[in-house]
Amino acid sequence: KEETISLYNPVIQNSGAQQTRQIGRAMLVNSISYEYVKKELMAVIYQAIARTNKDNANVNVLILTGVSGGTGSGMIIDLPYMVHDIFAAAGYTNYRIAGYIYTPDVQFAIPGLAANPMIINNLENNGYSALKEIDYFMNIEETNSVYDLPIADGHVISGRNIFSSCTLVSGYNQNGGINQLNVTMGRLTDHLMDMLTDIRITKNGVADQMSSAILNNKK
């Protein structure tokens, strides 16, 4: 009973979402924050559209985030669909979104967290809830479902899967231990930079940028 009370009635102190995903979501979807974030993303996305129109290429969007804290877990669904909405408003369909999601165990080696079972439990609960939601929205095209978010000036509605591809990034290593946070994040950064900058030669002798492989992991 006490565990249930603490889960549904968290005590909020200081700033941030305090590992409470409902607060993290509210921080994004309130009118002022939502429009501010959308405006910033629109500027970047419209620039990308203008550049790719010249080359007849795709716009590839990478979203890297954790889903164990209140902020990441709370925003993980609405932020990608904000991106979908921006492309839809621009009438642009030649784009893909790749999600790289850090699982909760990535943070387990942080000294201040490792010694606190309550925080670990919160991180695991947030991660589980977020991953269940991602799993659902990865298949809405097949189930004919929709994402629908009421906002101040109407609704954000999309029938597209949340990501074109989704990769989960764990903190565990091959020996069963947990890497330090900077090691896990550094390896993903190195991997993505290699993919974004490397060029391969196809069988037909055509130069192909390896960045296309970033989105080949379907689900």
Range-by-range predicted roles:
Residues 77-89:
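A glycine- and small-aliphatic-rich helix-loop capping segment at beta-alpha/alpha-beta transitions
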Residues 1-59, 67, 88-219:
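Terminal, contiguous helix-loop blocks that mediate binding/assembly
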